[in-house]
Structure formats: C-alpha cells, structure tokens
Swiss-Prot record:
Family: Belongs to the helicase family. DnaB subfamily.
One Gene Ontology cellular component annotation held by this UniProt entry: primosome complex
PANTHER family registered for this protein in UniProt: REPLICATIVE DNA HELICASE (PTHR30153:SF2), REPLICATIVE DNA HELICASE DNAB (PTHR30153)
Keywords: ATP-binding, DNA replication, DNA-binding, Helicase, Hydrolase, Isomerase, Nucleotide-binding, Primosome
Domain SF4 helicase as annotated: residue spans: 196-463
Subunit record text: Homohexamer.
Signal peptide positions on this chain: none
Gene3D superfamilies xref list: DNAb Helicase, Chain A, P-loop containing nucleotide triphosphate hydrolases
GO molecular function: ATP binding; ATP hydrolysis activity; DNA binding; DNA helicase activity
Protein task: The main replicative DNA helicase, it participates in initiation and elongation during chromosome replication. Travels ahead of the DNA replisome, separating dsDNA into templates for DNA synthesis. A processive ATP-dependent 5'-3' DNA helicase it has DNA-dependent ATPase activity.
Designated name of the protein: Replicative DNA helicase DnaB
Enzyme superclass (EC): isomerase
Binding, ATP: A227, R228, P229, S230, M231, G232, K233, T234
Amino acid sequence: MVYPIYMAKNKSYLHQINRLKIPPHSLEAEQSVLGGLMLDNEQWDSVSEHVVADDFFSKPHRLIFQEMQQLLDLGHPIDLITLSESLEQKGKLESVGRFSYLAELSKNTPSTANIIAYADIIRERAIVREMILVANKIANAGYDTQGRKSEELLDYAESSVFKIAEKRFKKDSGPKNIEQILDETVTSIEKLFLSPNDGVTGINTGYQDLNKKTSGLQPSELIIIAARPSMGKTTFAMNLCENAAMLYDKPVLIFSLEMPGEQIMMRMLASLSRVNQARIRTGQLNDEDWSRMSGTINVLLKKKNIYIDDSSALTPSEVRSRARRIYRENKGLTLIMVDYLQLMRVPSLSDNRTLEIAEISRTLKALAKELQVPVIALSQLNRSLEQRSDKRPVNSDLRESGSLEQDADLIMFIYRDEIYHENSDFKGVAEIIIGKQRNGPIGTICLTFNGHWSRFDNYCGPKYD
C-alpha cells in the first residue's frame, strides 16, 4: 500500500528534480554566431532571417544580439569597440560580462563559414524550449481551469502548439530573387503546355462552363459558396466534392456541421445514382433504383476516398487538426469542404461575433495554404437582400462579410429565379454568380438544377445574362 504522505513527499522530490533540469540550448552556437557577426557585419541579414533575440538562451547573449540590431538600424558598424561603447552608455556592459567577454567572443571565432548552421542550432533549441514552456502552460491550465470547459482548454492547447509550428517554418519565407521565381513559373507553364487538360489547372469541378471561368478549384485557395436558404448551396458544394472524389484518388474531406453523416450519404447516393432522394429517404425504391444505387455503392466502396465528419460546433483548431490527420494518413487531400462556416465556434471570441468569424476565416485560409488544397466554406447571406427588387447576391450580402470577402480567393453565389417567381421562364436553371476571383474573371454561368436528384448538372439550354 502506498501511503499519502509518501506520495506527497515523492511528488515534491520529483518536482524539485524537474526544476533542476536545464532547458536544451547551445552556448557554443550562440557564442559563435555573436562572434561571427562582429567579424563580418554582412552576415547579419542572413542570420536575422533564422534567429531573433528571444531565441538565445543566455540573457547576456540576448542583450548583445539586441544591441547589435540597434547599432545596425542606426547605420553603425558592429565591432568590439562600437558594441562595448554602446552597451556601456546604456549601463548594460556589466550585465553581458564586460569588455573582456566581448573580446573573448571575437577572439574565439576564427571565421563565419558555418554561421548559418550555428544559427539553425540556436533556432532548433529555442523551438524545443518553447515546446516545453507551452506544455507546462497547458498542464497548469489543466490544474487551474479558471472555470473553462474542456473544449476551451483543448482549443487553447491546440492553438498554442500550432503557433510554435507556424514559427518553425519562418525561415522558409521571405524575398526570393526574380530568377528563382521566374524559373519556377516557366517550369509550371511548360507542364501546362505539355498537358493542357482543357485549360483546367486546378481540381476539375465537373462543370464545363465553371471550369472555363475558374480553370478549376486551385490549391491553397479559400472558396466561399453562399446563398439564401433553399437555393441549393449544400447540394452544389456536395456535387463539387462528389465530382472531385470520382475524378481523383486523394480523399475529399467533408465537415458537415449542419447535417448528420447519414443524410449527407443519402444525398450523395441520390446524386450519383440519379435516384429520387425522396424515395431514398422513405425507402420506397423500385428494382431500377436499387440497381442504380448498387452500382454507386460499389464505386464508393472501391475508391473509399470520402471522409465525413458530422461533429457539431467545431472550432477552427479542431477542423485544422482533423484535416491534418486525414492529410497525413492518406499522404494528401484533394478537397476540403465545411458546411457551414457560421456554425463553427471560437470559445475565446464568443462575445464578439465579428472577431469570431474573422478568426474562422483566417484559419480556413491558413489551412488551405498549409495543405496546398482548395478549402470550400459555405456561408449564409444577410436577409436584407430579400428587400431588393433584384435578389441576385453581391459580395456585401455575405453575413459578417468583411473578413470573408477579404480572405476568400473565390466567392460564388447561387441564384435560382424560380424561388422568387413562380412562373419564371428559368425553372430548373441555377445561376452561379462569381462575385470575386482573385486570379480570374468574375461573371455568371448557368447550371441545370435537378433538385429531386440533389444535383446540379451542366447547362445545355440557351445562354442568357
């Protein structure tokens, strides 16, 4: 039997041991970088892209690095004399080990040949230390919840860890010479020339006219699909996912915050099988229906490349972590769809809906860029458009539109005239209005709406504006 007093003492002992652990660092690498910068000031621009002052473990080294930066910002050179003089004027020379330590740094660094490698060592150690710090903060948050629910704590933990991951790849960003960019661009153009693919450079939408306007759904893009209720925004987004799943091998990931997975699957079977969805929902199927559905089921089971997550009220961090997992397990994704954006939640921003939507929008855009896949997010529209005579949506009709309009690369609205005009000449016709396209034209294309199949198809009727 383990007695409470022993356990308490043992815990206290372990706590003291943990406190004695020294976080990972490399004083030698830090000294080599600082000494190298005194030898060759021109190395500063390269080094500063890899490390910042806070990456240095030693406080004196942090102070020295900061002083170097300030001297260079003022246009002064960095050497033993200028650095020691500047530190002395600010009363910091004693804190960094006096003139003798600066002289030692300079003396013990014979060259700057490996200065970037040393900077990388400093950065790596700093990231690991930050991981330890964040892990401790997460543990403390678990012990002292301050009234926060587990969902909020998980969101805090995930976002804290993700911030470290974002910093990890900082050195990969920054200016590139036009020669490098031009070489990459010409290579891309050559690939397109050799495999034109009817002008589709992204994910084929399955709709000819939409492909002509967009060249497909492009990697890294945030795509907003918006419409008033009953226009078919979920159906349209699902059709894009279905078409992508049939045309490509990599998985399609669907986050359905509004409908359960079973309803999504019924719609998918109706669409792909061309079977009336009302008969599927009620089970009133004939032999032909079963035959059509059996063929579809066999194809879906053979490909097995559609994932549906019907969890409700997901946070951006949850969406991101789950998408990453599916991406990692399948070595890639074709497309991600979120239905719909306004049902997502950010617990820490729940008191400010505008900031909450802005964070959701920013995270989805970041996810698209990180995984290099198109992310489709469905959105509601403001009711105010119902007061207009022309009820075709425009960008400003997006609910909480500011951040959505800014972050989106492609915005598509759905308008069906028959919803507002019972005797419309355009029954069964849907207008897909491209309100924004960062790298292409805006305008309108038409699709045929087959609601009984939960499906949009290519439009073969007369064109109209």
